[in-house]
Design a protein with these regions (language model features):
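Residue-level detector of alpha-helix initiation sites
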Residues: 52-53, 113-114, 160
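Glycine-rich, highly charged phosphate/nucleotide-binding loops
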Residues: 81-101
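An accessory alpha-helical subdomain
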Residues: 160-248
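Hydrophobic, well-ordered beta-alpha structural blocks that scaffold small-molecule cofactor pockets
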Residues: 11-13, 17-82
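E1/E1-like adenylate-forming module used to activate ubiquitin-like modifiers
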Residues: 132-182
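Structural motif
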Residues: 44, 104-105
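Short loop/edge segments at beta-strand edges and connector loops
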Residues: 72, 90-94, 134
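ADP-ribose/adenylate-binding Rossmann-like module
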Residues: 105-111, 116-143
């Protein structure tokens, strides 16, 4: 049995008995995570729980254009407003297993252990992505703290060990990496079309972009100094030093 599935079953057994010795949580810290970014545009996402935590999860999904269904007998005012304006679909009732049908992922954000377990077990039967807030063994994906600036996104994860530590790291990383890096990412993206059309191999394109990013002068420092025109000039100079191969 996979480590994740075993840890989840063990955690369910402990929770149903009203105990949790945290051994299953400790086991999860040794489980390697496959880091990925999901495109949620138009995908059906389920959030169970209408409190402040549910609000946080709903807003995260909406920010990525997910199609969100909320299931909860009641909800905080902000979630009620999202439902009124049509940003989310709100099923004002208790969770039912059928709520998982057709969903891409599910997030359980309730204070009721039985409900959270039901969401987890139903998602497991359907081989769905599932996150039960603050119960890492009942998650087959976790939600890292995210630093977002323009196209730049940096994820910070402690594998569920300490969300508070991840949030502190988020603040510190945002202070170090942020707007200058995001603006450089935009400038480099503008050159991607030229690179794909002109440079025939992945190695050529890798060398082109790494030469700019790691070059002298440092493009990030130029942006910090307000010299974005100089960054564009660097990119143009790099293009000239990487001419298209002659036709055979």
């Amino acid at each position: 049995m996979p480590a994740q599935a075993y840890a989840g079953k063990e955690c369910v057994c402990q929770l149903r008995k009203g105990i949790c010795d945290q051994s299953c949580v400790r086991d999860m810290l040794s489980t390697p995570l496959y880091i990925a970014c999901l495109r949620l545009t138009g995908r059906e996402c389920l959030v169970v729980g209408g409190g402040d935590v549910g609000l946080e999860k709903v807003e995260g999904l909406l920010a990525c254009d997910g199609a969100v269904t909320l299931v909860s007998p009641d909800a905080v005012p902000e979630l009620e407003a999202y439902a009124r304006e049509g940003s989310i679909r709100w099923e004002r009732r208790e969770f039912a297993d059928s709520d998982l049908d057709g969903k891409f992922l599910a997030i359980a954000a309730t204070s009721m252990t039985d409900v959270n377990i039901s969401v987890y077990e139903g998602a497991e039967r359907r081989a769905m992505l599932c996150n039960v807030v603050d119960v890492p063994p009942l998650c087959n994906f976790i939600l890292p703290a995210i630093v977002r600036t323009g196209p730049l996104a940096i994820a910070i994860s402690t594998a569920g060990a300490s969300p508070a530590l991840a949030k502190r790291m988020k603040r510190e990383i945002a202070e170090t990496y942020g707007e200058p890096y995001a603006r450089l990412a935009v400038a480099l993206n503008d050159a991607r079309g030229w690179a794909k059309a002109t440079l025939p191999t992945y190695r050529d394109r890798k060398e082109f972009f790494e030469g700019i990013v790691n070059g002298d002068p440092d493009p990030v420092e130029l942006i910090r100094a307000g010299r974005e025109d100089d960054v564009r000039a660097l990119i143009e100079a790099a293009k000239e030093s990487h001419p298209a191969p002659a036709a055979s």
